[in-house]
Amino acid sequence: MFSGIIDQLGRVQAVAEEGSARRLTLGMGYRDLALGESVAVNGVCLTVVSHDALGCADFFVSSETLVRSNLSALAVGAHVNLERSVSLATRLSGHLVQGHVDGKARLLSVEDEGQARRVTLSLPGELHPYCVEKGSIALNGVSLTLNAVDAGQADGRFAVAITLIPHTWSHTNLQHCAVGDEVNVEVDVLAKYVERLCHAYLTPSNA
Protein backbone atom coordinates (compact mmCIF):
# COMPACT_ATOMS: atom_id res chain seq x y z
CA MET A 1 0.00 0.00 0.00
CA PHE A 2 1.17 3.51 -0.83
CA SER A 3 0.08 7.09 -0.17
CA GLY A 4 0.73 8.79 -3.52
CA ILE A 5 3.47 11.02 -2.10
CA ILE A 6 6.51 10.54 -4.33
CA ASP A 7 9.78 9.88 -2.46
CA GLN A 8 12.10 10.62 -5.34
CA LEU A 9 12.69 10.45 -9.07
CA GLY A 10 14.58 7.43 -10.40
CA ARG A 11 16.19 6.82 -13.78
CA VAL A 12 15.92 3.77 -16.00
CA GLN A 13 19.39 2.19 -16.28
CA ALA A 14 18.51 -0.87 -18.37
CA VAL A 15 15.56 -2.67 -19.95
CA ALA A 16 15.85 -6.40 -20.68
CA GLU A 17 13.28 -8.57 -22.44
CA GLU A 18 12.38 -11.80 -20.64
CA GLY A 19 9.93 -13.57 -22.91
CA SER A 20 6.70 -11.56 -22.84
CA ALA A 21 7.87 -9.80 -19.68
CA ARG A 22 10.70 -7.35 -18.92
CA ARG A 23 13.29 -6.68 -16.28
CA LEU A 24 13.81 -3.03 -15.37
CA THR A 25 16.99 -1.79 -13.73
CA LEU A 26 16.41 1.52 -11.97
CA GLY A 27 18.85 3.94 -10.42
CA MET A 28 17.49 5.34 -7.17
CA GLY A 29 18.64 6.86 -3.92
CA TYR A 30 17.48 4.04 -1.63
CA ARG A 31 20.40 2.33 0.10
CA ASP A 32 18.48 0.02 2.43
CA LEU A 33 16.18 -1.88 0.08
CA ALA A 34 15.37 -5.50 0.89
CA LEU A 35 14.70 -8.34 -1.52
CA GLY A 36 10.97 -8.76 -1.94
CA GLU A 37 10.21 -5.19 -0.90
CA SER A 38 7.45 -3.34 -2.75
CA VAL A 39 8.19 -0.08 -4.54
CA ALA A 40 5.71 1.92 -6.61
CA VAL A 41 7.23 2.79 -10.00
CA ASN A 42 5.06 5.31 -11.85
CA GLY A 43 2.30 4.12 -9.54
CA VAL A 44 2.78 0.41 -10.32
CA CYS A 45 3.55 -1.84 -7.36
CA LEU A 46 6.70 -3.80 -8.25
CA THR A 47 8.87 -6.18 -6.25
CA VAL A 48 12.61 -5.76 -5.75
CA VAL A 49 14.24 -8.90 -7.22
CA SER A 50 17.85 -7.73 -6.82
CA HIS A 51 19.73 -4.63 -5.70
CA ASP A 52 23.23 -3.32 -5.08
CA ALA A 53 24.95 -0.97 -2.65
CA LEU A 54 25.04 1.82 -5.24
CA GLY A 55 21.28 2.29 -5.24
CA CYS A 56 20.32 0.30 -8.34
CA ALA A 57 17.54 -2.28 -8.20
CA ASP A 58 15.95 -4.75 -10.60
CA PHE A 59 12.22 -5.25 -10.99
CA PHE A 60 10.33 -7.92 -12.95
CA VAL A 61 7.44 -6.51 -14.99
CA SER A 62 4.80 -9.02 -16.14
CA SER A 63 3.12 -8.97 -19.54
CA GLU A 64 -0.18 -7.93 -17.89
CA THR A 65 1.51 -4.92 -16.30
CA LEU A 66 3.15 -3.98 -19.59
CA VAL A 67 -0.21 -3.98 -21.36
CA ARG A 68 -2.05 -2.05 -18.66
CA SER A 69 0.58 0.55 -17.77
CA ASN A 70 3.06 2.93 -19.37
CA LEU A 71 6.02 0.90 -18.13
CA SER A 72 6.06 -0.69 -21.60
CA ALA A 73 7.17 2.67 -23.03
CA LEU A 74 10.11 3.18 -20.67
CA ALA A 75 13.54 3.55 -22.26
CA VAL A 76 16.99 3.96 -20.77
CA GLY A 77 17.31 7.42 -19.23
CA ALA A 78 13.59 7.89 -18.56
CA HIS A 79 12.54 9.42 -15.25
CA VAL A 80 10.17 7.40 -13.05
CA ASN A 81 8.26 8.32 -9.90
CA LEU A 82 9.23 6.21 -6.89
CA GLU A 83 7.52 5.57 -3.57
CA ARG A 84 8.29 2.96 -0.96
CA SER A 85 5.37 1.23 0.72
CA VAL A 86 3.78 2.82 3.77
CA SER A 87 3.87 1.42 7.30
CA LEU A 88 1.43 1.75 10.18
CA ALA A 89 3.62 4.59 11.47
CA THR A 90 3.60 6.50 8.17
CA ARG A 91 1.73 9.78 7.80
CA LEU A 92 -0.95 9.37 5.13
CA SER A 93 -0.44 12.71 3.41
CA GLY A 94 -2.10 11.65 0.15
CA HIS A 95 -4.70 8.88 -0.14
CA LEU A 96 -4.70 5.08 -0.14
CA VAL A 97 -2.99 3.89 -3.33
CA GLN A 98 -2.66 0.16 -4.01
CA GLY A 99 -0.26 0.29 -6.92
CA HIS A 100 -2.76 -1.61 -9.07
CA VAL A 101 -3.09 0.53 -12.19
CA ASP A 102 -6.56 0.68 -13.75
CA GLY A 103 -5.50 2.04 -17.12
CA LYS A 104 -3.77 4.90 -18.90
CA ALA A 105 -4.77 8.54 -19.33
CA ARG A 106 -3.72 10.66 -22.30
CA LEU A 107 -2.44 14.18 -21.65
CA LEU A 108 -4.56 16.73 -23.53
CA SER A 109 -3.20 20.07 -22.32
CA VAL A 110 -1.05 21.86 -19.75
CA GLU A 111 -1.90 25.48 -18.93
CA ASP A 112 -0.16 27.88 -16.58
CA GLU A 113 -2.26 29.16 -13.67
CA GLY A 114 0.07 31.58 -11.95
CA GLN A 115 2.75 29.39 -10.39
CA ALA A 116 0.58 26.28 -10.72
CA ARG A 117 -0.41 24.30 -13.80
CA ARG A 118 -3.82 23.06 -14.85
CA VAL A 119 -3.59 19.69 -16.58
CA THR A 120 -6.38 18.13 -18.63
CA LEU A 121 -6.38 14.42 -19.44
CA SER A 122 -8.55 11.94 -21.32
CA LEU A 123 -9.46 8.72 -19.47
CA PRO A 124 -11.10 5.43 -20.52
CA GLY A 125 -14.88 5.57 -20.16
CA GLU A 126 -15.08 2.57 -17.82
CA LEU A 127 -13.36 4.61 -15.11
CA HIS A 128 -15.96 7.40 -15.18
CA PRO A 129 -18.10 6.05 -12.27
CA TYR A 130 -15.10 6.25 -9.94
CA CYS A 131 -14.11 9.84 -10.71
CA VAL A 132 -15.90 12.68 -8.91
CA GLU A 133 -15.12 16.36 -8.51
CA LYS A 134 -12.80 16.89 -5.51
CA GLY A 135 -12.21 13.15 -5.32
CA SER A 136 -8.79 11.49 -5.32
CA ILE A 137 -6.92 9.95 -8.23
CA ALA A 138 -3.36 8.70 -8.70
CA LEU A 139 -1.52 9.69 -11.89
CA ASN A 140 1.88 8.01 -12.35
CA GLY A 141 1.56 7.26 -8.65
CA VAL A 142 0.99 10.88 -7.61
CA SER A 143 -1.99 11.51 -5.31
CA LEU A 144 -4.02 14.32 -6.86
CA THR A 145 -7.43 15.97 -6.53
CA LEU A 146 -9.90 16.04 -9.42
CA ASN A 147 -10.94 19.64 -10.09
CA ALA A 148 -13.40 18.78 -12.86
CA VAL A 149 -14.88 15.68 -14.48
CA ASP A 150 -16.86 15.97 -17.71
CA ALA A 151 -19.90 13.90 -18.67
CA GLY A 152 -18.14 11.97 -21.42
CA GLN A 153 -17.12 12.29 -25.05
CA ALA A 154 -18.28 10.77 -28.31
CA ASP A 155 -15.31 8.38 -28.41
CA GLY A 156 -16.37 6.80 -25.12
CA ARG A 157 -13.66 8.52 -23.12
CA PHE A 158 -14.01 11.44 -20.69
CA ALA A 159 -11.86 14.35 -19.60
CA VAL A 160 -10.68 15.37 -16.14
CA ALA A 161 -8.76 18.40 -14.93
CA ILE A 162 -6.26 18.62 -12.08
CA THR A 163 -4.01 21.32 -10.69
CA LEU A 164 -0.32 20.71 -10.07
CA ILE A 165 1.27 22.95 -7.46
CA PRO A 166 4.92 23.95 -8.04
CA HIS A 167 6.25 21.36 -5.56
CA THR A 168 4.42 18.48 -7.25
CA TRP A 169 5.52 19.68 -10.67
CA SER A 170 9.20 19.91 -9.74
CA HIS A 171 9.36 16.71 -7.66
CA THR A 172 7.62 14.28 -10.04
CA ASN A 173 8.05 13.13 -13.62
CA LEU A 174 4.82 14.87 -14.61
CA GLN A 175 7.09 17.81 -15.47
CA HIS A 176 8.53 15.72 -18.30
CA CYS A 177 5.17 14.76 -19.84
CA ALA A 178 4.12 16.26 -23.16
CA VAL A 179 0.70 16.51 -24.81
CA GLY A 180 -0.20 13.07 -26.15
CA ASP A 181 1.84 11.17 -23.56
CA GLU A 182 0.17 8.49 -21.45
CA VAL A 183 0.26 8.36 -17.65
CA ASN A 184 -0.84 5.56 -15.37
CA VAL A 185 -4.21 5.92 -13.65
CA GLU A 186 -5.43 4.37 -10.43
CA VAL A 187 -8.86 5.47 -9.28
CA ASP A 188 -9.82 5.60 -5.62
CA VAL A 189 -10.10 2.01 -4.35
CA LEU A 190 -12.86 3.05 -1.93
CA ALA A 191 -14.99 4.17 -4.89
CA LYS A 192 -14.52 0.76 -6.53
CA TYR A 193 -15.63 -1.09 -3.40
CA VAL A 194 -18.67 1.15 -2.98
CA GLU A 195 -19.66 0.62 -6.62
CA ARG A 196 -19.36 -3.16 -6.28
CA LEU A 197 -21.43 -3.24 -3.08
CA CYS A 198 -24.11 -1.01 -4.58
CA HIS A 199 -24.27 -3.18 -7.69
CA ALA A 200 -24.69 -6.30 -5.56
CA TYR A 201 -27.43 -4.94 -3.31
CA LEU A 202 -29.27 -2.48 -5.55
CA THR A 203 -29.83 -4.62 -8.64
CA PRO A 204 -33.52 -5.36 -9.45
CA SER A 205 -33.32 -8.86 -7.98
CA ASN A 206 -32.21 -7.43 -4.64
CA ALA A 207 -34.30 -4.26 -4.65
Give the ranges of each region predicted by the language model:
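Conserved loop->alpha-helix
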Residues: 1-207
